[in-house]
């Protein structure tokens, strides 16, 4: 079958798949260390989803009041509902201030205080004095377009350090041999050629799989391509049941209204005009962690206190803030609300509803970005030749619930750490081992089979069924009955994928085929998500079970590992959460009841 395609071969030291914040920071970091580096991306780098991040990036700089990275770590562990690995969280929070200064030196145009320091705003779940003090102003912002500022800056650095970009190349599958990754195969959408990239290290920075759901803040390109490739390679994914619903997606549109809006003083109200978060989180109020706020909003709507004709959303008020503050600190939000909700934020509230926003689960890694698997008694056995970073990965620094503004930090800290580890492991321009020809043949055969699929089911119809099922059955609140039914329905939808029809058989800009490949990736991840959720019989972070409303620390402080075998069966396994810290600069943070 390989003879039927024009296959171009490449050899690099490292290949990064994805050109968002994590991918670019990793790519230019590796190139800077002297490694011959390629970056494959299915869209132009500055269109990657990092560009949509609004509110900011967290670090205990202390510009707006006393702060400490240890307090940041405490908040992150608490926010994770004690499912985050404390060694990785320590690494991230301790390295955060240096990461911000590095970004500033690269040229990120952060907003400034009157005395010229980087402006920091309050964000949900961020406190001082290990949760005993006032709210921390820890989130460094470039107005409400922080991701845009960071992404463009990192792209400039990548060009400076001569990363070789392969733009509008769709990554199809990993080249796996004897349990090691030897490279990746990609399809050039512009001319239809297939490319075999050999690499001593492949870095997956492909983002989340938010488009498995019907309503999501994610771009339509967020289809979890890295996670899909990992599952097909026979490797597990971790903690996939934990899907974050952001409290403030614009009603009906799903577009994000940053948490920074509440950080600047915005507040939520129900149909009675009541600031209801005061009942659910008396101390933090509207700046409780995202899972707490999303559940509170859902309860208000369920109990008949929603607003609008159908009483199915709530209002976010910013109209008490001065137009000057809105213009200076939240200019993008004002524009987004006008376009997608028809609202002038200086006069009227914004209609909002919890919307899928972030995947805490992903490809399991250590804090160097190296992919790890459970191998007998070794729970952190390294898979040679492959790394994962950003939302595609599960380090796990976010555990069961991510704190806002920790995701951009995750990208740059672990993008950098992956580059440093790769430079330590790889000798530049070292030779590649020969690859068995049947490995490439298998990948091409799968691609060709999907390309020539001539069944009875349209990809768009199947995708919509998956998205609606995930939205209704694996949502803010979950029950065994709903999850079991959802598992059965997603399994049936995945089986029907065998009967898809691809009308366009061409190889050049074939969006029909792109969507089919993306759906394959989404379906596998949707499947392990719903089965992992059905198996976890407790409530923790974003995984809220109405039939198991309490957190169960005796049985469930453990990571879920989920994979799919050759027969399509879901395999679930578990491994302990790392509760020990990396150094003795901070003690282990023991589990306590999570109150805001």
Swiss-Prot record:
Gene3D superfamilies assigned to the protein according to its UniProt record, in alphabetical order: FAD/NAD(P)-binding domain, Fumarate reductase/succinate dehydrogenase flavoprotein-like, C-terminal domain, succinate dehydrogenase protein domain, Succinate dehydrogenase/fumarate reductase flavoprotein, catalytic domain
Class in the EC hierarchy, top level: oxidoreductase
Catalytic residues (positions): 290
This protein's GO CC annotations: plasma membrane
GO BP annotations, alphabetical order: electron transport chain; tricarboxylic acid cycle
Native source species: Rickettsia typhi (strain ATCC VR-144 / Wilmington)
Modified residues (Tele-8alpha-FAD histidine): 49
Co-factor(s): FAD
A Pfam match: FAD_binding_2
Positions bound to substrate: 246, 258, 357, 402
UniProt subcellular location: Cell inner membrane
Predominant cellular place of this UniProt entry's protein: membrane
Catalyses which reaction(s): a quinone + succinate = fumarate + a quinol
Name of the protein: Succinate dehydrogenase flavoprotein subunit
Subunit architecture: Part of an enzyme complex containing four subunits: a flavoprotein, an iron-sulfur, cytochrome b-556, and a hydrophobic anchor protein.
Keywords for this protein: Cell inner membrane, Cell membrane, Electron transport, FAD, Flavoprotein, Membrane, Oxidoreductase, Transport, Tricarboxylic acid cycle
Pathway: Carbohydrate metabolism; tricarboxylic acid cycle; fumarate from succinate (bacterial route): step 1/1
Protein family: Belongs to the FAD-dependent oxidoreductase 2 family. FRD/SDH subfamily.
Membrane topology of this protein: Peripheral membrane protein
